[in-house]
């Protein structure tokens, strides 16, 4: 009789589970992408198409010719990376910058670790970091998914996406809700202390808070496994982001916060270990 082996979650039993979740996230991103098109017109379509084509091409070229293994395009993760990265970028980002960011996201953010489920940092964040290093980068311009033009409509699009993923049990509430609530509380405290700081609700509606909380911080591979760990992770992301914003880093505060906590996720998992089955 073979030995029974037990390990921590997540337990993925087949490719269908991964595809179901990734395609569910893609569907949840559709309202945000449509809102970007509504707000920015053809420029949003161009940016989305550049990002999508570049990410798909990067995945195909790297897996086929560098890694010498079957292409993994069917899992849908490259599409998620493309859409999230497009929402993080300014709408007038040059084509060549988007291409470099896409190759950085797929190559350095995912495939260099071995592929899906092995990366330690959200690939879309890696892609945005690559674009920020490019000459002439629009560092001070907000991403088209930051809700600058239509904050309430963008917030509605993000909430629709969040509601769908919660309904389908693609994600749990622990990370997004802890980020949103902590941001409101901490930003409210700073606004009371100094009225010059942004209103907490405006901070949540704009500045990429909802985009990061719903579609970036909730990435399975780069977030903690236990429920207490997820809540701590969300609180820490919000605290770092609010602190950075109070010191003048408006646009990239959420990206930096998620990036930092992605790196610290293994430590969070060690601190908040799930109780063993049968143990008090």
State each model region's role.
Residues 9, 57-69, 106-117, 160-170, ...:
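C-terminal ends of transmembrane helices
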Residues 28-35, 59, 78-86, 102-109, ...:
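Hydrophobic, membrane-inserted alpha-helices
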């Amino acid at each position: 009789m073979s030995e029974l082996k037990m390990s921590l979650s997540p337990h993925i039993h087949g490719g269908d589970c991964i595809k179901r979740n990734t395609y569910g996230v893609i569907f949840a991103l559709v309202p945000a992408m449509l809102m970007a098109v509504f707000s920015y017109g053809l420029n949003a379509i161009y940016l989305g198409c550049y990002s999508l084509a570049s990410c798909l091409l990067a995945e195909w070229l790297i897996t086929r010719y560098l890694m010498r293994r079957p292409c993994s395009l069917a899992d849908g993760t490259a599409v998620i990376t493309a859409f999230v990265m497009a929402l993080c970028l300014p709408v007038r980002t040059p084509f060549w910058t988007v291409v470099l960011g896409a190759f950085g996201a797929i190559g350095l953010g995912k495939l260099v670790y071995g592929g899906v489920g092995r990366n330690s940092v959200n690939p879309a964040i890696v892609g945005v970091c690559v674009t920020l290093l490019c000459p002439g980068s629009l560092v001070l311009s907000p991403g088209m998914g930051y809700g600058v033009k239509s904050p309430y409509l963008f917030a509605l699009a993000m909430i629709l996406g969040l509601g769908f993923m919660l309904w389908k049990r693609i994600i749990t509430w622990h990370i997004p809700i802890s980020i949103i609530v902590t941001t409101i509380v901490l930003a409210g405290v700073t606004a009371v202390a100094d009225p010059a700081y942004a209103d907490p609700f405006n901070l949540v509606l704009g500045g990429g808070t909802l985009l990061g909380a719903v579609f970036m911080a909730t990435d399975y591979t780069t977030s903690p496994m236990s429920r207490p760990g997820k809540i701590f992770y969300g609180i820490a992301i919000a605290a770092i982001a609010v602190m950075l914003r109070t010191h003048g880093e408006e646009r990239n505060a959420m990206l930096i916060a998620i990036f930092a906590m992605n790196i610290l996720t293994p430590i969070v998992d060690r601190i908040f270990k799930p109780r063993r089955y049968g143990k008090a």
